[in-house]
């Protein structure tokens, strides 16, 4: 069983963490994140470390303990280093382009599919078959990347579609003729 909740979170230089009741505010060079946590879980800041503790060992508190610690760590890493997800478009005629603040995908439909990035998330298109989603909020970066991938997920026969960089797509054999 994982003991992720017991690990301390080291606050890097340039990042400030403040607690107001059960609400944590994390400020850093990339941005600011505010999140309210369950008041049953205790969060303490000691020097440049954050400790998360739980009141009892019941199942609900154990689950909240690890989750709270992981979310706080993601917030600290996000405002200091940021997160990015890379996607690649595989298929004949599949391409992406950036028009202003919109991402326009041509992926075999009769119409182009458009995405507008939420506040704090940037979309880059280094090549017409590559998309990079960057931001300081891991949740928003992952959600936007998943929504882009969901437009045309990779199919198992030819492998065409939008996939994460390095994602392995299980391939299937086609039907064999008589």
UniProtKB/Swiss-Prot annotation:
An example Gene Ontology biological process: cytoplasmic translation
- On whether Ribosomal protein is a keyword of this UniProt record, the answer is yes
- One Pfam annotation, family name? Ribosomal_L6
* Annotated GO CC locations: cytosolic large ribosomal subunit
- Transmembrane domains' residue ranges: none
The keyword rRNA-binding is annotated on this UniProt entry: yes
Protein keywords: Ribonucleoprotein, Ribosomal protein, RNA-binding, rRNA-binding
UniProt-listed Gene3D superfamilies: Ribosomal protein L6, alpha-beta domain
One GO molecular-function entry: rRNA binding
Q: What does this protein do?
A: This protein binds to the 23S rRNA, and is important in its secondary structure. It is located near the subunit interface in the base of the L7/L12 stalk, and near the tRNA binding site of the peptidyltransferase center.
Q: Which family does it belong to?
A: Belongs to the universal ribosomal protein uL6 family.
On assembly, the entry states: Part of the 50S ribosomal subunit.
Q: What is this protein called?
A: Large ribosomal subunit protein uL6
Taxonomic placement? Bacteria, Bacillati, Bacillota, Bacilli, Bacillales
Q: What gene name does this entry carry? A: rplF
